[in-house]
Amino acid sequence: MTVNGIKQMKGYANLTNDYMFKRVFGSEECKDILIAFLNRIVGNGDIEDVTFQNTEHLGPTADDRRAVYDIAVRTKSGEEYIIEMQLAQQEYFRDRSLFYASYPILNQAALAKEEFRKAHGDAGVFRWNFRLKPVRFIAVVNFPMTHGSGWDESRYFSSYRLKEDESGELLHDKLQFIFLELARFDKKEDELETYCDKWMYLFKNMSHFRERPKVFDEKEFDRLFEIAELCNFTSDEYYNYQNSQKMIYDYENTIDFAKKQGEAKGREEGLAEGLEKGLERGRIEIARNMLKAAISVEQISLLTGLSEEQVQSLVDEANV
């Protein structure tokens, strides 16, 4: 689309779009948006600045699995934040969250040693007292996570820490997992009560806005609405956004078709697993199309919910 065509566009971008999510929350130009979001979601309100960190962490050996985050930042006080947008449901997403959070924990020994050498040079023997800085993992997920039988189905926010089983005593406050479940959020504009409500509403509905709703007239949303307004995009930005958006549409359409196929198969065969088989076939077909578009194995895994090993097997199959 031409620049003039973009300038005539009305409305705002989809914040769950991979390109847009990383641009809004993972770029230096929009750092103030990320800080406002973190202060509202974590609730302490004391984050003044962050520095962006490497989003790819390699395992100890070449054969070990690596971790690739959407966004990683460190605050002035040394707290580490990992922020993820997950559209596709994954069976072991909680496990992956824990795996991801382990890297910044392990890296703190190296950081402590680096600080020691800056202060003392090569003199002295480095010893670390194991004092950790907090690590917080925040995930916005587009599916309902599994909870216990007493869980309120409308509760979209969950926060987990390490606690003693019987008393609930906190082991320490250095590891926290926060999950925001878009599938459980169904509040209307006039029902928004908290800033967390407002952020969830934006994730689900911003692409449907034609103008900025009055409920978002606070100053902290100014930059977000400026960046997300389609008429402010350059040609390259719009191209990248649309490419990422097409992946979402393709995924949703294929999964919807796969569900129908699976339901039909289940009715025909009387098998409860018919739906799941159809979904799995849909994910595999999406992955094959993404591979043809030269999308990375890691990105395909994140978007489809297939493991990297499953996607790699499709690569090997195509190369035979």
Briefly describe each language-model feature range:
Residues 1-320:
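Elongated, amphipathic alpha-helical interaction scaffolds
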